[in-house]
């Protein structure tokens, strides 16, 4: 009877449309910083290739000891936060206690990666992930060895008992006193890609996640005074004795996260009939309106960009306590963490707003598209960083809007990338970059400014058509880089397809420069005229002085790697007159010569700032007075260095 019921469940699930389903129940022990959990996973193979193993992500084992891949690469530091606490208390783990498959005990068939001889031969992760001396396979991956392959259309029911201990929070998930942020907290099935096998990379410092869409039913039992926020919608809340159980349901999502704290303050709002919940710590009530305003700006902007409103039935914004900001700035489906400091920030300093918009935006460029964050970080971080700036521009106008300082969106990303002198491309796996800073620059900043340039080149209407097509074709799938590029090609054509593909897949830079801008008084004729008559010098000088004509020469140069792109050149004369020239981009440089009654004041390449990705704006303008030009250059470089300092502090890895 039990076996028949199990088969009935498998059949019912296979007819539901999704190939993955999680039913999870957990009990939180705040004193021990642990949860005891049980999950039932039903997984269906929807590929042509039989599956002989089932890998599980056990991400929280990244905090098991100081020799894991994550802690080896990070040294216990993430963004600006460090792993702290008493020696054993600061670490965490996810321990698999028992496994059954289709009702049969499979506990002996489960192995952590560290228990497997030559785990590289399983082909669940790439060989280059563990080539460094200090970086070896760890327990962030576990393998269930099946007795029989799961063929196409077949489903398997897996039951797992597990214990998770939270680490002291410094990187996304963990605890601070009685506050808990549960991200990547349960055993999660990797993504099966048929002939390519399982995609189940190790958990690196810079890599995030990749998962299949699933339905989740989750019960969370906590002490009665605790408030829980989670992915999905709350189905029920029941108190029994000194315990309270929350039940949540989420459909068609790629992850499930939750938070619990006995000091949460709660605020509610609505957007387009979508309920919005804000969880924030005591003392930050003055930020509530500001946080909801940013969230609504994000909802509006992403709907406008893609042509599709937020599709889920609820959204929760979590503002962690200031002492636990390691939990801030992280995305999960239907729930994200932002962050406000305990002190008041001027309304014109919109870094908290930027963080909220960015993290919400990952519900599109990560959660809805489910791109592979391990291998193509730019597809979520880069596209989403562009969309963040788009949201700031639409919702606020300026990123920084103070009486003495105005900084428009996209500026920090352009300045950030302009400081990078290497030749790496964004299209690399997250662990393959030479440094954390280069990963951030190429995964966030470079795609942002090249997408902004693409928008300027094709126009906002056509640009939004690209994203609308991308959503229509690839939402709720796992699009590849070529899928995105193909949408650019279909809407904007081959030229712009080549442009954005070159930007992402190579180390190319774009750099227009004014090579020279000079004026010379036209000299009077001397010697013999063209009829071989001697020229009367005094007469020529008098006539020339009356005319006083200048011969002007402006040379614009393409110093970058992108060819055949048009650029406009503005020439401003000292009398205020303006002249505009256009170069079609053919060749390496173009000279413009003309006569005028006034000399050149300055020449400006790309005055409308079409090329937001121009690598060096200092050389876009050249004054006829060289000393002025030197002063402009020094000022620009000083400003770039100062803003880059703040970029490193505020935007690395959000």
For the regions a protein language model found, what residue spans apply to each?
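N-terminal, polar/Ser/Thr-rich
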Residues: 13-36, 77, 176, 497-502, ...
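Solvent-exposed beta-hairpin/edge-strand motifs
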Residues: 55-115, 119, 123-124, 183, ...
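Extended, low-hydrophobicity, Ser/Thr/Pro/Gly-biased non-transmembrane segments
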Residues: 77-93, 97-98, 104, 134-136, ...
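Hydrophobic helix-coil surface modules that form long, contiguous segments used
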Residues: 189-198, 205-357, 386-389, 398
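Beta-strand-rich binding/interaction modules
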Residues: 230, 497, 510-606
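Catalytic Zn2+-binding segment of zinc metalloproteases
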Residues: 360-376
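Acidic/His/Gly-enriched intrinsically disordered linker/tail segments
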Residues: 381, 385-449, 453, 457, ...
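Amphipathic alpha-helical substructures
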Residues: 399, 440-526
